[in-house]
Curated annotation (Swiss-Prot):
Effect recorded for E801K: In STUT1; slightly decreased assembly of the AP-4 complex
Organism: Homo sapiens (Human)
Function: Component of the adaptor protein complex 4 (AP-4). Adaptor protein complexes are vesicle coat components involved both in vesicle formation and cargo selection. They control the vesicular transport of proteins in different trafficking pathways. AP-4 forms a non clathrin-associated coat on vesicles departing the trans-Golgi network (TGN) and may be involved in the targeting of proteins from the trans-Golgi network (TGN) to the endosomal-lysosomal system.
Highest taxon listed in the record's lineage: Eukaryota
InterPro entries in the cross-refs: Adaptor_Complx_Large_Subunit, AP4_complex_esu, AP4E1_C, ARM-like, ARM-type_fold, Clathrin/coatomer_adapt-like_N
Summary of the tissues where the protein is detected: Widely expressed.
Protein name per UniProt: AP-4 complex subunit epsilon-1
Gene3D superfamilies per record: Leucine-rich Repeat Variant
Oligomeric and partner information: Adaptor protein complex 4 (AP-4) is a heterotetramer composed of two large adaptins (epsilon-type subunit AP4E1 and beta-type subunit AP4B1), a medium adaptin (mu-type subunit AP4M1) and a small adaptin (sigma-type AP4S1). Interacts with TEPSIN. Interacts with GRIA2; probably indirect it mediates the somatodendritic localization of GRIA2 in neurons.
Family indicated by similarity: Belongs to the adaptor complexes large subunit family.
Amino acid sequence: MSDIVEKTLTALPGLFLQNQPGGGPAAAKASFSSRLGSLVRGITALTSKHEEEKLIQQELSSLKATVSAPTTTLKMMKECMVRLIYCEMLGYDASFGYIHAIKLAQQGNLLEKRVGYLAVSLFLHESHELLLLLVNTVVKDLQSTNLVEVCMALTVVSQIFPCEMIPAVLPLIEDKLQHSKEIVRRKAVLALYKFHLIAPNQVQHIHIKFRKALCDRDVGVMAASLHIYLRMIKENSSGYKDLTGSFVTILKQVVGGKLPVEFNYHSVPAPWLQIQLLRILGLLGKDDQRTSELMYDVLDESLRRAELNHNVTYAILFECVHTVYSIYPKSELLEKAAKCIGKFVLSPKINLKYLGLKALTYVIQQDPTLALQHQMTIIECLDHPDPIIKRETLELLYRITNAQNITVIVQKMLEYLHQSKEEYVIVNLVGKIAELAEKYAPDNAWFIQTMNAVFSVGGDVMHPDIPNNFLRLLAEGFDDETEDQQLRLYAVQSYLTLLDMENVFYPQRFLQVMSWVLGEYSYLLDKETPEEVIAKLYKLLMNDSVSSETKAWLIAAVTKLTSQAHSSNTVERLIHEFTISLDTCMRQHAFELKHLHENVELMKSLLPVDRSCEDLVVDASLSFLDGFVAEGLSQGAAPYKPPHQRQEEKLSQEKVLNFEPYGLSFSSSGFTGRQSPAGISLGSDVSGNSAETGLKETNSLKLEGIKKLWGKEGYLPKKESKTGDESGALPVPQESIMENVDQAITKKDQSQVLTQSKEEKEKQLLASSLFVGLGSESTINLLGKADTVSHKFRRKSKVKEAKSGETTSTHNMTCSSFSSLSNVAYEDDYYSNTLHDTGDKELKKFSLTSELLDSESLTELPLVEKFSYCSLSTPSLFANNNMEIFHPPQSTAASVAKESSLASSFLEETTEYIHSNAMEVCNNETISVSSYKIWKDDCLLMVWSVTNKSGLELKSADLEIFPAENFKVTEQPGCCLPVMEAESTKSFQYSVQIEKPFTEGNLTGFISYHMMDTHSAQLEFSVNLSLLDFIRPLKISSDDFGKLWLSFANDVKQNVKMSESQAALPSALKTLQQKLRLHIIEIIGNEGLLACQLLPSIPCLLHCRVHADVLALWFRSSCSTLPDYLLYQCQKVMEGS
């Protein structure tokens, strides 16, 4: 922005306070605050809405008199306009001031114009008739030499100008694209963007100028042009492929920090500009390999650089992932994007978890197996307290549904549907359930029961296409006629059972579906006669809670059944009661039924059995009525008018006053959206108002799915619910509709779950049911032990998924202690866990099959316990949980040297054990605390080194370690030093043992001290611990391996691709031994046996087999979490080496 513009905008606030009556700025300020301020203070002091309305009406009356007075000056008008704006903001009508706002924008000076334009943009809308009076003012200001006037005119044009006024200002705005000031060019581009939104045809001739704006020397102008290009590329991406290089170049400059600093947001370079460019690239590269290759490098760079812990960087990462999966795929980018999604999903922050689920929902279409890595996290999200997380999780499950997990996913959707009260959620989920049921239904019974639940819960708010599609499916059937008949018969039996239930209320659309099905297919029944079905339908017809439209469906069903019944007193009674009905529609149907009932042969020919899906030959020209039409015209009947002609006449008469009294309404048909089957089957040949019906359908409001509240009879719900309240209708019980859905949970052997908590077993089984069918089908049979678990609703005895990470039902067994681990050289950097306060940006992801663990006690006693979610520390997105970037302070060389010397001396004493590097966990100008780990045979030894960096003594230095839920600190919980000498270092040791299996946890604490007996300070720190810190090698023989293998029930399998450096099995096993502390028991040909233990004595066994360049891993343990965790670590090791 130029200096002139900055000075002008800086001076604007002062203009509000100058040239006011009273002689100076102080008086002006007092005048302004005394009127507007007193109004605000008066309103805030009120205690009721009535008092507020009374005060505002008094103020509006005063303002109306003031603005209408001829003696009111423009300065006074400006102040009145500000008060009018405030009253309008509170919701009160101030339309008398609209014309004065336009006058103020036309006549005032710079400040008064600004207030006038502001009031106009807030008061008027695009269709307001007074807006026409503003056109000349805007044209004049666009031609002004004053920069601020031009900007104000461009702003109001982009806010409220309709498409009819575009030609008056378009040439002037085009000229402003060449203006010397960048702020004018930017506002001109935004105004053209508004024109493109409301009237794209009027700006097609200036597309070449949009390209010039894209290449503008000012970043703001270029950024404004991206709005236009994003919309145009959405409409036609092929026409802008040649600009891909330009967009890539711009994104490279933005990511590389080449833009001015004022475009940065929290040290992130132009984040919103990056997001728009990523969206544009995603549209351009879709299904285009050549174009996508141009953007691979910049997308890789964007993923790499977006590492700051800030919300806006998460938004950039999300858009990067979206773009990577939108363009032509590249394996390296897909892997990085998948890791990024994992960090989002596993984040404890709700917003980031939602972003992860949103991204996972999108990319799951390209890679369904990606959900397997986060299956237990998804299970946890199903019970998340945040409804948005729940809803997005259900959307994710909807995307991964297949024929094998359909029953469990639909059950979860129905459970959420019963709990939800939001209409939008109900409509959305009901549509998804109906779609899945039709696509993947395992059998007829499940399909009918599921659709019954959909109709019951969805009620009358569901989209009308859902029941229509269901009825069409029943009518058209499949290729197998026998299966079609079975489906129809089950539907009829199900509906008769539901109708037998007493005091149950069914939605109107559900009743309509029942009536149609019973009318069409009741002939399939063996035990029930048509007379019995008619009696049940008649009972519904006499229920006052049934709407008129539903009664039309019911009487149509009765009409069809009457042709099949021999004789029925119920039909005679129905005809007698409804031929005198006040409802004209029902009276018409009753008379039709009466005449057809008198001629049985005619009824059977008109209503044949099972002919609902037959194709009918329709004479669209209605040529058979030519004689009837000629006769009517000869007798003076009005000629036919096309729908458009009648619509024009109707519109021309809308504003004409009606001086005739309204006619009395004899009855109401009650039809609002869908025509009844009776009207289709019985009245199609005799209807005389087909043209009017077509006009209503095409030119009237579409009210399908909208509850009708008012009609000619008055308030409809009130009348329809008169008897409903008396009858005490109850909702449909879920057991009667979905009696078999709960069978989707697989049965397990009771002996295997004696020591496992019920909730954890349900989660494990739910995971295996939800994510079945997503991986490749392969498995390995080890030591002659075959899988025996069967699944009731699956068509195969067992679906073996190599990549699904399924876990079988588990049982805990008492394990004896084994020999201690061997001394193996491990890589320190692999085990040095990220600390919370160090600002480390290494991203970590733990994709575990289970995060809630059931295991035996660390003593040798069995333990049946449910581990709550809060006991597990889910890894955050960026290793540390805070959102701030840590900048370590400068420490003195002496203190660092002393600390390093002490650490080195202590590590020399423990050279027989593996240890990590020392890492600083917290510091300030006075003190520094570092920590490192020593992996002993029987425990984890944590060492904290405290350094006094100042030249003064510290009094009462106290280092306190808080007890953790999953850990046991065997040493003293804290240590206090009465005096800590200047520039000295002290070291404290704590032995940490695991009490409960976990995925990742924290040891937290603080260091407090006093300086000179007066100043007290405290620093908090946190050290991250993972399960790998408590893994040790387990030395056993091959015979012991075989015995333990057969006794363990928790297993997980996965195929991992080997790199060239790991082509041989020994080298691959050596890598696992070094990285994961596994003990190699034996290598036999292309198979290998390894073992480890979780301290103190929970063993885990690994069987490896090489197939070409694929390493098949099979873990088994008595702990349900350990195999999943080690499998994930093995994948990381094999992919990273």
